Amino acid sequence: MTIRPATPADQAALLALHRAVAQDPNGIARMPDEITDAYIASLLNLQPPVGLQRVVTDEAGELMGEIHGERYRLRIFTHILTGITVVVHPRHQGRGIGKALFSQFLRDVRQTFPDIRRVELEARATNEASLRLYESLGFEREGVYRNKTRNRDGSFVDSVAMALTFTESDRYSR
């Protein structure tokens, strides 16, 4: 398994990966038809200083997963990395790949952006596996957005706001 920055050469594989993950109605927020070439191209722009993106490949170079996040553009919030999305291809889920990818991503965030003090994300309240993963990485539940997410069947589910915060001493101890 290799974790590395995404490159423009990954665009087609990223498109296929995100579309495969979007087939699960309880997975990522985007619907399959919202996973477009333009969307994937926008992810490839999440490179320093505006954001960070990593992919994980197997020994044969096949893309198994991707994670990305971006900084807020307003100066009062530039210490925050937000919009975190992690995807692992359905064939590779449940094998620790997402946790390894996310762990490396957080190390890279600390190294690349020493001024980041907060990494934030949202998860469906019903996505217990994701909530457990995020908590195992140190994220804390900060609140609930009632009925924020509309499911494909028209029903609504709460979203859980989560964050991982760093202090000045964390920069040197992790």
Task: Label every PLM stretch briefly.
Residues 16-33, 46:
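Helix-loop element at the rim of GNAT/NAT acetyltransferase active sites that forms part
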